[in-house]
């Protein structure tokens, strides 16, 4: 049986999750660990969230069992609490948001109690933000916070900003697309266009739907946008907002329940100069629209804003995350 330092059991159920899993594996490898990432095989589509989670948890268990039969890892990391629900052996749990927060009522009827047990039994928790621990009930299990690394995309800031505003709305209700559209209608000027990524819909004056895009194409749109706007009803992390900052795009948002790691940064909480790098407003059309208008009309030079935004996301950059993985996470995973 082959030896291995760290086995990561991932779900890979979304592009964002796959990217986060790849980043964790890469960071462990750069820290000198012999790490391997395996992913669950996508199950068939089912109708309810509770059954969907069961199917994914079973798929993650199968992937873990098969890999454990071939290797003897010193540590196992389950990527998401769903991957850990039916684990074949205890391991660290990596998560952005717990079922306690994003599976209310009947949607999480079986997941929440099992999750509480797993978070107690795990040797280590690896949340992506401190807010995820709070939403999980502040478990006493030892934890290391490891953010998702965010970097400027190829091309970075500095290009032509020929799109007034961009939003991402694969899940329209959760992302608050109705709020964004109402605010946009209230403040847009004749020559300004809002591009809606991740969704098909009927174009109308001032609004264009870009549909589903691969990540490179999406980031290319982001580099062209002056403002990224979102009004989520719940935000598990806020990776799109961090990517916007990484590419020098001004960000307008609303407060939202959930860990929402990007929100304090956008509001200027903890900033050395106390200055926010985003515009945070109430979700009403008047308030959100005013924030969108203020961001669009912001007189700060684009290059100056891009430099400020990059400085603000320094804790989320790959170099910072690599230090946390090498100095804090890996020693805890591999200790006797």
Task: Provide a role label for each language-model segment.
Residues 131, 149:
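Carbohydrate-associated surface elements
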Residues 150, 156-175, 181-186, 194-195:
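Conserved donor-binding/catalytic core segment of Leloir-type glycosyltransferases
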Residues 77, 82, 86-106:
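Active-site proximal beta-strand in glycosyltransferases
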Residues 54, 58, 283, 287, ...:
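A charged, aromatic-enriched C-terminal amphipathic alpha-helix characteristic of glycosyltransferases
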Residues 106-128:
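Membrane-proximal helix-turn-helix segments that form the acceptor-binding/catalytic region
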């Amino acid at each position: 049986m082959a030896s291995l330092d760290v086995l990561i059991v991932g779900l890979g159920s979304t592009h964002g999750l796959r990217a986060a899993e790849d980043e964790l594996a890469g960071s462990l490898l750069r820290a000198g660990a012999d790490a391997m990432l395996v992913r669950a095989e996508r199950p068939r589509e089912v109708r309810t969230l509770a059954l969907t989670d069961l199917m994914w948890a079973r798929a993650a268990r199968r992937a873990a069992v098969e890999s454990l039969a071939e290797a003897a890892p010193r540590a196992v990391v389950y990527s998401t609490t769903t991957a850990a629900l039916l684990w074949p052996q205890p391991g660290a749990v990596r998560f952005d948001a717990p079922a306690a927060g994003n599976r209310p009522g009947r949607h999480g009827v079986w997941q929440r109690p099992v999750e509480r047990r797993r978070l107690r039994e795990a040797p280590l928790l690896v949340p992506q933000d401190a807010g995820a621990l709070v939403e999980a009930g502040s478990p006493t299990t030892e934890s290391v916070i490891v953010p998702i690394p965010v970097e400027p995309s190829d091309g970075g800031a500095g290009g032509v900003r020929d799109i007034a505003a961009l939003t991402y709305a694969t899940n329209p209700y959760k992302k608050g697309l109705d709020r964004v559209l109402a605010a946009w209608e209230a403040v847009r000027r004749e020559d300004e266009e809002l591009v809606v990524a991740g969704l098909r819909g009927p174009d109308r004056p001032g609004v264009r739907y870009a549909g589903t895009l691969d990540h490179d194409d999406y980031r290319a749109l982001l580099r062209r946008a002056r403002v990224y706007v979102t009004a989520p009803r719940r935000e598990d992390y806020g990776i799109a907002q961090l990517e916007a900052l990484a590419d020098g795009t001004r960000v307008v948002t609303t407060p939202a329940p959930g860990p929402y790691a990007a929100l304090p940064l956008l509001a200027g909480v903890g900033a050395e100069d106390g200055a926010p790098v985003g515009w945070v407003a109430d979700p009403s059309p008047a308030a959100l629209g005013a924030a969108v208008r203020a961001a669009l009309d912001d007189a700060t030079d684009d290059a100056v804003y891009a430099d400020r935004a990059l400085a603000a996301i320094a804790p989320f950059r790959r170099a910072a995350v690599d230090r946390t993985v090498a100095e804090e996470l890996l020693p805890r995973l591999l200790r006797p």
